[in-house]
Amino acid sequence: MLTDKVAIVTGASSGIGRAAALLFAREGAAVVANARGEAELQKLVSEIEAAGGRAVAVAGDVADEGTHRALLEAALGRFGGLDIALNNAGTVGPYKPLGEVMLEEWQHALAMNLTSAFLGARLQIPAMLERGGGSIVFTSTFVGTSVGIPGMGTYGASKAGIMGLVKGITADYGARGIRANALLPGGTDTPMAGDAAQKEWAAGLHALKRIAQPEEIARAALFLASPMASFVAGSALYADGGNAAVK
């Protein structure tokens, strides 16, 4: 499905990002994988290469523009271009009412969840235009878009801003072949999901009464990244186990 494509995947050392990097590689893409931890990234690259795929690791913080430049340089220098970006890395928290959130906490959430997405897209777009277009997928969330959750207003606001970015990119570059879309997972069994009690609570938010496995969300990302979604642009794909239906 992604034969001869080149994909950047951020937040690739665990959870949704790792599952997506493995899936994209199995589908034929060369993967430029990013996370802050070098050791886990190298394990991912080794797993992809052992299965016959192509991948390279670029460690770094997505809140740093230099990380995005290094990712793009790896895509161009190692694999010759860029076709797909899954801007997936982010953070959760702080878990507190908005009236108690410190400015530094607010700024950190925006830097990790929204500004990082802008920094990536700003560099990815010109590279994709050189190839006649591409697909940019941003991982957002149902929190702040379909539902507000007490104590998660900062997280929800920082992720809800992704939709403005998606629509802006679509308006500016859709006619030139770039598709931008947001993927909105429900609760997913990742290291950020918390302990068993937190996962059980999250499961109760969804019509399916369970949380997702990372591979389930990765398949939704694959759809948006692939030619199967060739007429999907400026949209939000809820992979939320029916949360939006029962909120």
Where are these regions (language model features)?
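Alpha-helical segment proximal to the catalytic Tyr-Lys
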Residues: 126, 145, 167, 171-172, ...
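Short, small/polar-rich loop/turn modules that mediate ligand/substrate recognition or access, typified
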Residues: 174, 179, 232-234
